[in-house]
Design a protein with these regions (language model features):
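Short acidic-hydrophobic sequence patches enriched in Asp/Glu that either
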Residues: 17-23, 43-46, 63, 67, ...
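Active-site rim elements
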Residues: 34-45, 57-62, 137-144
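Intrinsically disordered, low-complexity polar regions and short flexible loop motifs
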Residues: 133
Length: 176
């Protein structure tokens, strides 16, 4: 599935942003031998999970250095998320300046919140309460009532960047 393009949401026209219109898309898997028809899940998954999932179902060892995680434990358990499953999805876009004019940014998305950092030639943070504001219209970054969760998200972001070995976003500029 492809999430398509913005149609004016957030004032944009592209799909490289970390907003829901760009990030959320359906994943449909049919494998009657192991997956019960009609199963659904709200587990946080990413495209890096596809390869380990296919390897796992094929009975092939998953390399230890692969970034994703197999979705098999979720798929064969009628969509139930294991207790030790990831708490956030990580996203990093670093191709600016390019024809799309999308600023470099990275961030995490948990079940309840999203934290985004635009960097390089700007330094802007956005944070959204996805339960109270699913359309991401009200940036709550820096608001006192969100200070505790903001601190937790900042720590989770750093931990997630270390996990995916993406700890120095400015290094991407040197490569490009």
């Amino acid at each position: 599935s492809d999430q398509g393009f913005f149609l004016g949401e957030h004032g944009w026209f592209d799909k490289r942003f970390m907003y829901e219109e760009c990030q959320r898309m359906p994943l449909i898997i049919r494998y009657p031998k192991a997956i019960k028809a009609g199963s659904t899940s709200n587990a946080i998954s990413m495209n890096v999970d596809f390869a380990p999932t296919f390897l796992d179902f094929a009975g092939v060892d998953i390399p230890s250095d692969i970034q994703g995680a197999s979705l098999k434990p979720i798929l064969v358990n009628e969509g139930k998320t294991p207790a030790d499953w990831r708490k956030a999805a990580y996203y990093h876009y670093y191709e600016y300046p390019a024809e799309h004019s999308v600023k470099r940014h990275y961030g995490i998305r948990t079940q309840d919140f999203k934290l985004i950092h635009f960097y390089n030639d700007i330094d802007e943070w956005e944070m959204y309460d996805m339960k109270a504001d699913p359309r991401e219209m009200n940036n709550v970054f820096g608001k006192p009532e969100y200070a505790k969760v903001q601190k937790e998200l900042m720590e989770l972001l750093q931990d997630t960047q270390k996990q995916y070995k993406d700890t120095d976003p400015d290094e991407k500029e040197k490569v490009l």
